[in-house]
Amino acid sequence: MPAGSRAGSRLRSGSLPRPSRLTLKALRPAYAPRTPDSNGDLDTGSELGPGSPAPTAEEVEKEMAGPSQLCIRRWTTKHVAVWLKDEGFFEYVDILCNKHRLDGITLLTLTEYDLRSPPLEIKVLGDIKRLMLSVRKLQKIHTDVLEEMGYNSDSPMSPMTPFLSALQSADWLCNGEPTHSCDGPIPDLSSDQYQYMNGKNKHSARRLDPEYWKTILSCVYVFIVFGFTSFIMVIVHERVPDMQTYPPLPDIFLDSVPRIPWAFSMTEVCGVILCYIWILVLLLHKHRSILLRRLCSLMGTVFLLRCFTMFVTSLSVPGQHLQCTGKIYGSVWEKLRRAFAIWSGFGMTLTGVHTCGDYMFSGHTVVLTMLNFFVTEYTPRSWNFLHTLSWVLNLFGIFFILAAHEHYSIDVFIAFYITTRLFLYYHTLANTRAYHQSRRARIWFPMFSFFECNVNGTVPNEYCWPFSKPAIMKRLIG
């Protein structure tokens, strides 16, 4: 279909907003400078040449309603006044047309910033938004005029502000996914996007750099912390209070629930299942390097805090079934050998590791809760079964710790609280880009600033096969 017939069909169907009002018939052959008339309004008649009378408002109205069209370049202040009245902005005709002499070209380049800032300083937010919507309709119709003047959608000075581009291309995320379609395909988040910082537009690109060297550094960090924790556990075992002198402290849960001998083993079984689920999610996730880095940094930080709480205060054993006595390791090498045994056995009774005195706070609760939160955060929200299973394993694991009388209730509560708060604080900072360049964030959270400086925004839940296809599979499926 020819371009003219297509444009005519669009005009007849009404798909364009008031086209006969926005492009008008040519009123005069040439442009001449405008001068104020005796009433203070602009004398648009000067454009007709010397001695030509200025058109009245009724004449301009008639011309605008006519079948012919006038290029917006030839719009005068009276045309803009008629357009403003037609759009319902009567109260702004005087300030825009008479006082500030807004013609067609200047109307086309009007921005929301112009309306908010001096000399206009319009105070009514609704009027600002409605006026800008009307102006953007004009800009959309007259994009050829804007491009001729050097304004285009790629230009940083374009009146078609980056805000519109951000609304059209931004991906609003929930749990790492678009909110409008959590079950649909994940859009490409590597494209440039816009954001507001301190009231101004800032152009930034979504970055999700894997930075494997930082991931390796975070793994080294967490392994060093685990080794240090094992050594502290050896020291606190030497300082465990005598059971005859310091009996178990009163505890509401432990006093009310009888001990289940096999419960602590079930806690570690729950932890192993959660660990396998997390390893599977980690392998299949597209941004596995970022996920592993975050897990190691968070786990290392929580266990480093646990080292201090264990060391500064030694609580009495929580039950008479625990045959814990202060065990003295003679030399430093013996302590290191015992610490290596705890470290290599992951501190689990399933691997034959038995410790005493490491009560404030529960390391098993930390691991269970951290794995649960990572599984639920980095899997799609629609995977309800997996999320329910993860929470069931977490809560049952905590219950089994208390049912086995291996920890006081306060140990479990503090561990759960610290782990969840640290996880949520970390991800809130990571998902809020304004904190990435914050001096306060760099001072208070130096490790966070180091690990997350090149992760710009929420990590989307995208999955891919981590291994290369075998040669025979490539030949079969391409």
Swiss-Prot record:
Any coiled-coil regions, as ranges? none
Q: In which pathway does it act?
A: Sphingolipid metabolism
Example GO CC term: the record gives: endoplasmic reticulum membrane
**Which InterPro entries does the entry mention?**
SAM, SAM/pointed_sf, Sphingomyelin_synth-like, Sphingomyelin_synth-like_dom
Describe tissue expression: Expressed ubiquitously with highest levels in macrophages and testis.
Q: Quote the Pfam families the UniProt record gives.
A: PAP2_C (PF14360), SAM_1 (PF00536)
> Can you name this protein?
Sphingomyelin synthase-related protein 1
Cite the record's Low complexity compositional bias ranges: 1-22
Report the residue ranges that make up the SAM domain in this protein.
75-141
- Family per record: Belongs to the sphingomyelin synthase family.
* Underlying gene: Samd8
